[in-house]
Amino acid sequence: MSWKTEPGVVRYGYPLCLLSLSCLSGAHAEEYSAADRARARPDSALVLEDVTVSARRREEPAQTVPIAMNVLAGEQLNDAGIYRTEELQQRVPSLLVSVPSPRYTSYGIRGLGSSSYNDGIDGSVGVFLDGVYLGRQGMSLVDLIDIERVEVLRGPQGTLYGKNTTAGAINLSSRAPTFAPEGSGEVSVGEKGLRQYRGTFSGALIDGVLAGRLTGYDVERDGLIDNRYDGSELRDQNRQGLRGQLLWTPSETFSARLIGEYAWQDEQSNVFTASHYSQTTLERSAFVGYRQLPIDPYARRVQQDKPNAVKTLQTGATLELNWLLDSGATLTSISGYRDWSYDASQDGDGMALAIVDDATVRLDQHQFSQELRLADSPNQHLDYVVGLYYLRQHLNRAVGVRFGEDAAAYFLGDRPEIEQFHITPAMIPSSLLEGGQQSFDGEQRSDSRAAFGQLTWHATERLAITPGLRYTRERKQAWLSRSVSGLAPLGLDLVSQLGGNLLRSTALGGEYYRRDAIEESSLSGQLALSYAFDDDLLGYASWSRGYKAGGINLDVVGPTVEPTFEAERVSSLEVGLKSAFWSGRGMLDLALYQADVEDYQALTNRPPVNEFAPPIRDNLINVGKVRLRGIELDARLRASERVDLRLGIAWSDARYRDFANAPCSPSSAQWSCDLGGKRLFNAPEWSASAGVDYRYPLEHALELFSGLDYQFRSGYYGTLEGGPGSYQPSYGLTNLRLGLRRGDRRWEAELWARNLFDEDYITAVYARLGAGDYGVLSGAPRSVGMTLRTRW
C-alpha cells in the first residue's frame, strides 16, 4: 500500500483524524507515480514505518491483509516494557489474558476464551511460536526476548491455523540469525528486588553459509503477597531461559533454520486474596475457632500454613526448511517438538489450618507437530498456499490431596447437629479424615491431521477474492482413575461409624476408573473480499468458520455427567476498513463483527449426591449458543518528527443466547440457572489503549525520549456463575518512561514507572475451597525502576 496526501486532512490537522471517521473517506482521484510520492514526502522521518506480517503464511504489508490484527515489533515491545505474553493485552484492547496459574492460563479475544478449569478442554486462542502450535496455553507464558514481531489476529483463523483458533491466533516470531555480527544486552533493576538480565548475540559461523544466534534471560523479584502466618512473601518471580539458533544457507534456493529452547520457572505463585466468604465457611471457621482475614481483595495478604511452589520446565526444538522450486513456488516444512512440565505443591485450603495438608499437581505434556506448505504466485492474478498438518500430543497427569487433622471438625462445623447436641471440635475424632489421601491419575493422547488450502484471486487491480478450506480429523483417548488411601480404622460405635463413613465418602469418594475416546472431523473455511478504493483505503468483508476440538472430561464425574463433549464451532461475519492518511503519517483501521458460537463448551453444576455435599461444577458439556458483536478501532499518528500517538478502542457485546443449565451464584441456593441473554464472563464491554511517544534531539548525537501508555477495561465477572466476590471492577493503568540514548540507539538509559498511580485492580478470580468462596489475583502495585540497554 502506498500513501498520498489528502488536502482536507492536511488543512484541518491530525486531531480530527482521531476523533472522526471522515479521514477514512474522500475522493482520492489523482493517481501518483512512485516518483510523485517520493517528492510528496521529502522527510521520511514523518512517515510511519511499513509493517510486514506473515498472517497469511506469506510476507506482505499489514495494511493490505483483510484481517483485523494488531502487530507489535520487537522494538515496540522493549519500549513499552512488555516482557511476557500476558502483558500483550496492554497494547491490544480486544485481548484478555487471565493467569491464575500456568495450568489455568486463558486467552480471550473479543470476549471468547477458554471457559473452564479442566485439563480436558482446549483454548479458543491459538498461540504459535515460530510457526509451532503450543498445545497447552500455559506453554505460551514465555519471555518475549529477541522477538521480531507479534501478530494478534482477531476472529476465527481456522483455515490456515487450524483447530482451537475460534477466537483468534497469536503469532510470536523470534529474530533469525544474521551473518553480520550483532548483539544486545539489557539490565533492569526495580522495586521489590527486581533484577532482570537479557542478552543476545548473532553472527556468522561460516561466512555466507552458517550463522548462529544465542539469547538468554534471567529474572528475579521478591514476592508481592504478605503471608501473615509466617511473614514470608509469596508471588515472587524466578525464571531463566535460553534460545539457540542455527541458520544454514548452502545455496540461494534452500535454507534451514534450527531453534532450540529452554525455559525454567520456580516461583511461589498461584496465591489468591480472599474476596468473599460464604456463610458455610464463616460457620465452619467459627466452630474450629479460626479467624479469617478481613475481606479486602486489594490488601495483598494471605494466611496459609503451606507454601505455593510452582515449577515449570519447557524445552523445545523447531526445524524450518525452505526450498525455492524451479517453478518459483516455495516449499516450507516446519517440524516442532516440545516438552512442558508443571509441578505444583500448594496450600489446598488457603488457610492456616490443617484441612488439606498437601495438594500436589504434576502435568507432563509432550507434543510433535509437522506442517508442509506450498506457496506460489504463478501470475499477477493469483496467490495460493496449500498444506498438510499433523499434531500428536500426550498428557500425563497426577494430582494428590492429603487431608490433615483439622479436616473432619472443619467440614462438620456447619451441621445443625453441632449446636443441637453441643458438640465441640475436641469431640470429633481427627481420624475421620486425617491422613486420607486422594490420588487422581490420568493420561490423554490425541492425534490431529489436516489438509488446507487458500488462494487469492486478484479479479481486478482493486478487487481481490480469497476463499479457503481446511479439513481436520481429530482423535482423542484418555483414562482417569481415583484411589483413596491412608485412612485408619474408625473404631467407633455403630451410629458414629455410619456418620464417619458418610463423611469419608463425601469428602474422599471411592475407587474410580474410566476410559473414553472420541473421534471427529471438521470443515473450516473462509471467504473474504477486499477492495482497494485507492492506494490509501482498503475495504473488506469476510465470512469465516472456526473449530474448537471436542474432548474428554478429565475430572472424576458421576453417573449423571457425560464424560465427553462435542466440538465448538464459530461462524463469523466481519467488515472493515484499513486506511492511511496525511501522506503516510497516519493509519486508522476499523472492524465490525458478529460471531455465532454453536455447542459452546462450559462447566455446569450437577446436583449434590447427598445433603452433606454442595453442587459440584464438573459437568463439562456443550451448553448452547453464544453471540459476539463488536466494533474495534485502531489508530496511529506521527504528529511530528518528535511525537507519535496511538489509540485503540474495542466495544464488545458478548452474550449467551442459550444456556439453560448454567451454574448459579452460590448465594442463590439454586442448582442451575438460565443465563440466556446475560454477558459472558471475562468479557469486558469496553477496552481501550492509548499512548504517546516523544523524542527530543540533543547535541553530540544524543536524544531524550519519553513514553506514556494508558490501558482501560470496564468491569466484568471473572467466573461463569457470577457469584459475590467474583466481579472485577473497571480500572485504568498508566505506565511512564523517561530516558536518554544515542540517536542510533546504540545505548539507552531509562527510568520507568508501571502502574504510575498505584491503581488497585484484579486480573483473575478463583473459586476457593468452599462453595461461594472466591479469591482474586490482584494486579501488581506501582513499581519504579531503571533499565540500561546496549546494542552493537
Over which residues does each language-model region extend?
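Solvent-exposed loop segments that connect transmembrane elements
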Residues: 225-233, 270-303, 347-358, 400-441, ...
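Membrane-embedded beta-barrel scaffold of Gram-negative outer-membrane proteins
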Residues: 320-326, 330-346, 532-548, 555, ...
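Periplasmic-side early beta-strands and strand-to-turn transitions of outer-membrane beta-barrels
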Residues: 171, 178-180, 188, 200-304, ...
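Acidic, small-polar-rich N-terminal luminal/periplasmic segments of exported/outer-membrane proteins
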Residues: 37-180, 575
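Outer-membrane beta-barrel translocator/receptor signature
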Residues: 122-124, 136, 145-154, 159-228, ...
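C-terminal beta-signal and adjacent terminal beta-strands/loops
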Residues: 596, 711-719, 740-792
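Gram-negative outer-membrane beta-barrel transporters
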Residues: 384-385, 461-465, 594-596, 621-720, ...
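N-terminal Sec signal peptide and the immediately downstream disordered periplasmic leader
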Residues: 1-82, 86-92, 252-253, 317, ...
